[in-house]
């Protein structure tokens, strides 16, 4: 019972006051199967990437941490190819730092911070960790390429679909109110995908 009421509160908080760059929602109608999305931080190799995560809430939550993994591939020393994350707040003590006072928003914010500040001394991917430590330009290049390939494809496809469905500027249909609405929606989509433009 405590789990269900707490999850309702947390989901409401995530829906009404999400942390910057983070969204989280229920997948289907199951309250314990969530999806999250983290936007890559500015001035990081993940900038403008949209990273999807799976959040599974265990039966003993909040006494056990949520199980979170990346669904979007990411080039990072603390995240392996299966999306598993090496982060202390995702583990119980004594090896971890999970406490029942923490919540899903806090954990997702911690993951967002880990994306900005990798911990090469506690890696899941030794080769990427070594590259991060000893050849940072190569790490940054590879991480940017992975972000471009895996975390930006969907948004590019969405942008292209919207652009393909818009009439030409000289087309008389532009004056149709539906087309005007679509054109204004495109401006909103462009701002969503390119907020600095």
UniProtKB/Swiss-Prot annotation:
One Gene Ontology cellular component annotation held by this UniProt entry: nucleoplasm
Induction: Down-regulated following hypoxia. Up-regulated in breast cancers.
Phenotypic consequence of residue 2 to E: In FANCT; abolishes FANCD2 monoubiquitination; abolishes interaction with FANCL
Residue ranges, annotated region (Disordered): 149-197
Enzyme class: transferase
Coiled coil: none
Position(s), cross-link Glycyl lysine isopeptide (Lys-Gly) (interchain with G-Cter in SUMO2): 191-192
Pfam families: UQ_con (PF00179)
Annotated catalytic residues: 86
Protein name: Ubiquitin-conjugating enzyme E2 T
Taxonomic source organism: Homo sapiens
